[in-house]
């Protein structure tokens, strides 16, 4: 997997974006060819797929966590399927809380706290494991563009600040697919980190299935200290904004590529930077799980999803997925 930072031209078009357009056309053709040749399988349970149209953090993990808690409260059995980004996984594996991020991916380790998790790089490999676990629902994280399985219910996550970037496909832009088709097909659309009342124009046709959501801190952190922040996630700017909105004094920050696997040298450099700033290190849960026993002096900001209209979510999911039939 190529690990990239989110370049500026992905948000605002410049000469680099236009120079890369020819490669984007190849990406588009290969995606069309893949979808045309695919023969989607029916997984042995109803599928809720959570995904996005673009590269970078849009709050998918928090949506999956929210769904897991919702289903657990209703006594609905479920399994979460995740892609195991950044792991050395060779085949589909059932994840437990003893797995490390290198073995299961950072998201797999985090999600294992909420229920049964299968980490895989090939969706077809999960079938035997699903047959063993026999869930009512499969929550699939980040396989929206995968044409090889049937989806009963789809949720598209959109970051309210980045939206769809410059509107170009990878690598000229951040898009995995053009949004209109995905938004039309979606059962629900989450506009994440939306603190404004105005809905972006591109989403106004979908207001009847739009949920405004915020990612908010879920643990208490000492606000009297100075903090040096770092992260290797898809949308680090949102993490830093969350820290500041929480009232923490951030004296500096460092950004790593998404799903970055930290080395001992990185950790030593971070401690040195924190010392220079007379600060304590603070990071995300996705980064924190990668340090194992070395993270005792690193503060972790836990976050969760807060939504403004949970009734719409409940109605659409439990009605269309027919969980209680």
Curated annotation (Swiss-Prot):
The keyword Nucleotidyltransferase does not apply. GO terms for molecular function: ATP binding; tetraacyldisaccharide 4'-kinase activity. GO terms for cellular component: plasma membrane. It is an enzyme of class 2 (transferase). It catalyses: a lipid A disaccharide + ATP = a lipid IVA + ADP + H(+). ATP binds at residues 54-61. Keywords: ATP-binding, Kinase, Lipid A biosynthesis, Lipid biosynthesis, Lipid metabolism, Nucleotide-binding, Transferase. It comes from the Bacteria. One of its GO terms (biological process) is lipid A biosynthetic process. Pathway: Glycolipid biosynthesis; lipid IV(A) biosynthesis; lipid IV(A) from (3R)-3-hydroxytetradecanoyl-[acyl-carrier-protein] and UDP-N-acetyl-alpha-D-glucosamine: step 6/6. InterPro entries: LpxK, P-loop_NTPase. Its EC number is 2.7.1.130. Belongs to the LpxK family. Transfers the gamma-phosphate of ATP to the 4'-position of a tetraacyldisaccharide 1-phosphate intermediate (termed DS-1-P) to form tetraacyldisaccharide 1,4'-bis-phosphate (lipid IVA). NCBIfam families: lpxK (TIGR00682). This is Tetraacyldisaccharide 4'-kinase. The gene is lpxK.
């Amino acid at each position: 997997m190529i690990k990239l930072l989110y370049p500026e031209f992905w948000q605002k078009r410049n000469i680099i974006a236009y120079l890369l357009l020819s490669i984007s056309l190849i990406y588009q053709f290969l995606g069309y060819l893949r979808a045309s040749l695919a023969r989607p399988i029916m997984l042995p349970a109803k599928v809720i797929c959570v995904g996005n149209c673009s590269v970078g953090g849009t709050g998918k993990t928090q949506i999956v966590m929210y769904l897991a808690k919702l289903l657990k409260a209703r006594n609905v059995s479920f399994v979460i399927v995740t892609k195991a980004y950044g792991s050395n996984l060779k085949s589909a594996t059932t994840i437990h809380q003893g797995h490390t991020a290198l073995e299961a991916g950072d998201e797999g380790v985090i999600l294992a706290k909420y229920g049964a998790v299968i980490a895989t790089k090939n969706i077809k490999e999960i079938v035997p494991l699903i047959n063993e676990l026999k869930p009512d629902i499969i929550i699939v994280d980040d396989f929206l563009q995968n044409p090889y399985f049937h989806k009963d219910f789809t949720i598209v996550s959109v970051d309210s600040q980045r939206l769809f970037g410059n509107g170009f496909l990878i690598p000229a832009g951040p898009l995995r697919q053009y949004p209109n088709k995905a938004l039309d097909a979606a059962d629900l659309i989450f506009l994440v980190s939306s603190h404004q009342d105005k809905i972006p124009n591109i989403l106004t046709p979908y207001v009847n299935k739009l949920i405004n959501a915020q990612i908010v801190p879920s643990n208490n952190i000492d606000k009297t200290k100075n903090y040096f922040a770092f992260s290797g996630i898809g949308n680090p700017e949102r993490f830093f904004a969350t820290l500041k909105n929480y009232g923490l004094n951030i004296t500096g920050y460092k950004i790593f590529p998404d799903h970055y696997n930290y080395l001992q040298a990185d950790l030593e450099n971070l401690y040195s930077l924190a010392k220079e700033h007379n600060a304590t290190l603070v990071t995300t849960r996705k980064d924190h799980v990668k340090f194992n026993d070395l993270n005792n002096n690193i503060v972790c900001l836990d976050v969760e999803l807060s939504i403004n209209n949970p009734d719409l979510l409940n109605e659409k999911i439990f009605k269309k997925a027919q969980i209680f039939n």
